[in-house]
Amino acid sequence: MAESYNICLDIGGTKVLGVVFNSKKEIVFRLKKKTKSGGDSSDNIEQLIISVVKELIEASGIKADKINAIAAGAPGVINQETGVVLFSPNLPWRNYNIKKPIEKEFGCPFYIGNDVNVGVLGEYKYGAAKGYKNVVGLFVGTGMGGGLILNGELFTGNKFKAAEYGHMILDPEGPLCNCGQRGCLEAFSSKQ
């Protein structure tokens, strides 16, 4: 059976990290590119993602038709089923379907979820939370987010906002957060 590959992306407010995995879950190649700060457009971020994936394919020496799927984690409220980023405080995405253009470009399935949900799911399946039925994760970076595993299942809530701890308002007169509110936990404790 011929070797096949998956590409995973961590799309953040300051960088896009891409990794190619083979069918044995071994890292074949990794790449990191900076995202521009400030008002970069949705189309520019989309083009950056496409260029990172193309560079990963070329630099790793694999053929594009050997890619099974591309998966990504990104900050914000994301409908995992449709691939629509409803809101991202650290990227210029509002009701933006990133799934369609990536699938069109590469001809393989593209999956996207909230970056912290994806991270907590990874810890649950392969890392520090392996073997636990219920897991709470809190990740701090450019922003701050949480993820929940309840009874062995990722819990996102009915509006994909479960565990958005970073946007709990601690002080209504506090510093302005990237989400537009004042006094969010994220505004006090993240790298934003």
Regions flagged by a language model, labelled:
Residues 17, 80-82, 146:
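Glycine/Thr-rich phosphate-binding loops of Rossmann-like dinucleotide-binding domains
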